[in-house]
Amino acid sequence: MKIIADTNTFLAVALYEPEREKIIRLTLGHDLVAPDILPFEIGNALSAMLKRKRIQPEELLPVWDVTQQIPVDLRSVNIREALKTASKFNIYAYDAYFIECAISLYCPLITLDQRMIEVARSMGVKIMEVI
């Protein structure tokens, strides 16, 4: 089965967050898919964590490297449709890209973002429950 994986799940695994083991259990043996903006979003999140001192400079590249070792199929998304979703539900376009990916591929979504879960569910997307 293909599973659309949100950026925060990659970071939770790489940073050994409490949700790490459950994410791995839920996705083991399945194919992860994400919008092709995933590497950029991971890079942005890591630089924000560095800026907020959540990670140290010497951790930045090793954490990046771990996220890049997780196999994922990067897909383009219909940005126009994603923007409609972002506008309708007042969410960031980046979040809407993951929802649009799940809708267009008829795949479940795994995320730690509660608002994204609410919006995706309201649009008929199946959620892989982590929390």
Predicted regions and their residues:
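Short, well-structured N-terminal submotif of metal-dependent ribonuclease cores
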Residues: 1-37, 49-61, 123
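Acidic, PIN/NYN-like endoribonuclease modules and their adjacent C-terminal/linker elements
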Residues: 2, 35, 99-131
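A cross-family signal for key residues in well-ordered alpha-helices
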Residues: 11-12, 24, 44, 83, ...
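Contiguous, function-dense segments enriched for cysteine-driven chemistry
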Residues: 11-19, 68, 74-75, 110-117, ...
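Structured helix-beta-strand junction loops
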Residues: 29-30, 66-70, 105, 123
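Active-site-proximal, substrate-binding regions of enzyme catalytic domains
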Residues: 43-79
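Active-site neighborhoods of divalent-metal-dependent phosphate/nucleic-acid chemistry enzymes
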Residues: 69-115
